[in-house]
Amino acid sequence: MIKFVFQTQFSGMAKIKLQNRTFVPYISNEEIEKAIDRVADKVNADYAGCTDVPVILCVLNGSIIFTAELLKRLTFNCELATIRLSSYQGTETTGVTRKVLGLTVNLKGRRVIVVEDIVDTGHTITDLTRILAEAGASDVKVCTMLFKPAIFKSTIKLDYVAMEIEPKFIVGFGLDFNELGRNLKDIYILDE
């Protein structure tokens, strides 16, 4: 796992503006891809030779790009499912998780790998773990692209973490600011 702290020098990456906010370069696509490679290697090692078909649960919308990149690297049979939860309004977490779109597959007796874009306070992943237990999942692992350990308040274990970051608001590679910026190949941090 790599820990990222804000740096001011990035070659080829410029500031961007989304609505009335300015974001500056934070993590390059090259670093993101390397981190995904490392996480995929760990997941593949843990699931090598599995005889069941684990469910890869993509948490919409933020983890779509991370999930797609991770799936391309997995070497075992798996099934893709989605769920959509919401806990953000603008740049702030509300602390309240809403289920916007329910599970798309029956999880009773199944092993599940939750794929998240970012874990910060841990409220959403805690609520999701409860939802999956109620749905009958036999085992739940959590894989996140980004983790903010400085503000994490949950006891949930994060099994696979690609990168640790500061508790700052970011966009890009699936993460958004009011639904904008998901398509950016790099990750940017709010210029405060």
Segments (PLM) and residue ranges:
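PRPP-associated nucleotide enzymes
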Residues: 2-192
